[in-house]
């Protein structure tokens, strides 16, 4: 279900955005050139049950090797710009200028976070999402090197588990996310999970923010669940 915002996009503020997330809806744009936004509340919502997160043996080896350096909130703007750029199999983007401004605003008040994956000093991939209560809403991810976005997701899940999160919302489910254990839940079930997650508070800083977390550390947290 979607409803287009017919008012000026500038009327949507970071505070309005957070209240929308608390109601189970999120904004999108038709394309990068479309200044309007529309609200989305899928009949079937994508989530990754944190206790059922799956990491393949091959990916675990990559994560453990620390071929990439993983940081948090080091370059949020570069991550959202990477997510907005064309990717293989995806020529267009729903991240328009207003979306970018809104999520940078959420980042500035500590409600939106990025995970960066670096290779030889260059940004190889990453993801960003919104934190509210014990829920994390994954917005988008990208990669410029093989497995970079997958490594970002592994490190994100480790951080969420360490911080006491109970809900990882992926909005939709793709074959890529299914490989990590993503499932679809009906809207009413999702609302129940969201309401429960909003009753408490989690910490995105439960793992260090000032130094990279190693792959071995991240996998140890995941395998304890």
Swiss-Prot record:
InterPro entries: Acyl_CoA_acyltransferase, Leu/Phe-tRNA_Trfase, Leu/Phe-tRNA_Trfase_C
Signal peptide (residue range): none
Source organism superkingdom: Bacteria
E.C. number: 2.3.2.6
GO cellular component terms, semicolon-separated: cytoplasm
Chemical reaction(s) catalysed: N-terminal L-lysyl-[protein] + L-leucyl-tRNA(Leu) = N-terminal L-leucyl-L-lysyl-[protein] + tRNA(Leu) + H(+); N-terminal L-arginyl-[protein] + L-leucyl-tRNA(Leu) = N-terminal L-leucyl-L-arginyl-[protein] + tRNA(Leu) + H(+); L-phenylalanyl-tRNA(Phe) + an N-terminal L-alpha-aminoacyl-[protein] = an N-terminal L-phenylalanyl-L-alpha-aminoacyl-[protein] + tRNA(Phe)
One Pfam match: Leu_Phe_trans
Localization in the cell: Cytoplasm
Gene Ontology annotations of biological process type: protein catabolic process
Keyword Nucleotide-binding among record annotations: no
The keyword Transport is annotated on this UniProt entry: no
GO molecular function, one term: leucyl-tRNA--protein transferase activity
Cited function: Functions in the N-end rule pathway of protein degradation where it conjugates Leu, Phe and, less efficiently, Met from aminoacyl-tRNAs to the N-termini of proteins containing an N-terminal arginine or lysine.
Protein name as catalogued: Leucyl/phenylalanyl-tRNA--protein transferase
Encoding gene per record: aat
């Amino acid at each position: 279900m979607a409803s287009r915002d017919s008012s000026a996009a500038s009327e949507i503020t970071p505070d309005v955005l957070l209240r929308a997330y608390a109601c189970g809806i999120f904004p999108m744009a038709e394309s990068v050139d479309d200044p309007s936004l529309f609200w989305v509340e899928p009949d079937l919502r994508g989530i990754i049950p944190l206790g059922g997160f799956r990491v393949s043996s091959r990916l675990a080896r990559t994560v453990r090797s620390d071929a990439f350096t993983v940081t948090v909130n080091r370059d949020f703007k570069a991550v959202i710009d990477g997510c907005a750029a064309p990717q293989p199999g995806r020529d267009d983007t729903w991240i328009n200028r207003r979306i970018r401004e809104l999520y940078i605003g959420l980042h500035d008040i500590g409600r939106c976070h990025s995970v960066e994956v670096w290779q030889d000093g260059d940004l190889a991939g990453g993801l960003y999402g919104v934190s509210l209560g014990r829920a994390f809403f994954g917005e988008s991810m990208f990669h410029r090197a093989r497995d970079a976005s997958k490594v970002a997701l592994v490190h994100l899940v480790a951080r969420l588990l360490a911080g006491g999160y109970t809900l990882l919302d992926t909005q939709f489910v793709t074959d890529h996310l299914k490989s990590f254990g993503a499932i679809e839940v009906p809207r009413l079930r999702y609302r129940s999970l969201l309401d429960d997650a909003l009753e408490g508070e989690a910490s995105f800083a439960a793992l260090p923010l000032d130094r990279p977390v190693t792959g071995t550390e991240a996998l140890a947290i995941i395998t304890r669940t």
